């Protein structure tokens, strides 16, 4: 994820989905959203105990509350029963609204977060899910 004039763009991203997120944010019917991140890390990140990975998670944990968000949970992937996607970690980030997700790149600390993300994350798929938590 990279920032550009406080807009979110995703490498190899789904611009149609980002447009939906923007439409929801502007609709007056914005609602909480859970972003489920399926992450594959570079070997150099040292997942799960390496310094680059820990720095990335620490900065992310400091950044999300700036927009009212938080990491709900994260877990190492132990394997896959179905499919071919090779990932290291599943991370669930909750946002109070779609607008909060869009506001993240403009927050203090975002530039450092995206710098560390680029160092650590080899590939990611981020699914937008219902943000109503049990």
Indicate residue ranges for each PLM-predicted region.
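Short S/T/G/P-rich N-terminal loop/turn motif that feeds into the first structured element of a domain
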Residues: 1-88, 96-103, 130-134
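Short, Lys/Arg-rich amphipathic alpha-helical interaction segments
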Residues: 92-95, 99-134
């Amino acid at each position: 994820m990279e920032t550009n004039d406080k807009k979110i763009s995703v490498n190899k991203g789904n611009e149609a989905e980002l447009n939906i997120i923007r439409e929801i944010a502007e609709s007056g019917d914005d609602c909480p959203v859970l972003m489920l991140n399926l992450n594959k890390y570079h070997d150099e990140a040292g997942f799960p105990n390496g310094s680059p990975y820990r720095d990335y998670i620490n900065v992310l944990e400091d950044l999300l509350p700036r927009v009212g968000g938080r990491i709900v949970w994260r877990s190492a992937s132990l394997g896959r029963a179905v499919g071919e996607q090779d990932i290291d970690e599943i991370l669930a980030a909750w946002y109070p609204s779609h607008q909060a997700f869009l506001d993240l790149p403009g927050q203090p600390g975002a530039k450092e977060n995206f710098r560390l993300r680029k160092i650590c994350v080899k590939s990611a798929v981020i699914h937008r899910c219902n943000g109503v938590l049990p």
